[in-house]
């Protein structure tokens, strides 16, 4: 008889980035919450409008963004582009997110 072995690898250090959040003050999903971002304290997050205007930037992001732009006002409902750079992983993640109030 033959023995077959399977190995399953789990990675618990992968950040999970949502594609939407609702910063409406109800206490649910009010910030752009990136799971496991605390494993990468040396990170940079940039958020842009669809036209390419930078509206938010943080070095050492800690899930604090609640849809407030650089002007101190709530950004309009809609799609935004993010760039998250993780120094430790030497990786950049990019994508779209939707803000809904």
Roles of regions detected by a PLM:
Residues 5-101:
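Short loop/turn motifs at secondary-structure boundaries
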């Amino acid at each position: 008889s033959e023995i077959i072995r399977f190995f399953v690898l789990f990675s618990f250090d992968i950040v999970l980035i949502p594609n939407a959040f609702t910063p409406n003050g109800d206490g649910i999903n009010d910030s752009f919450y990136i799971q496991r971002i605390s494993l990468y304290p040396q990170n940079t997050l940039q958020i842009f409008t669809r036209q390419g205007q930078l509206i938010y930037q943080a070095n050492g992001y800690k899930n604090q963004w609640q849809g407030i732009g650089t002007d101190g006002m709530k950004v309009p409902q809609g799609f935004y582009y993010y760039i998250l750079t993780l120094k430790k992983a030497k990786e950049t993640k990019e994508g779209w997110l939707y803000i809904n109030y």
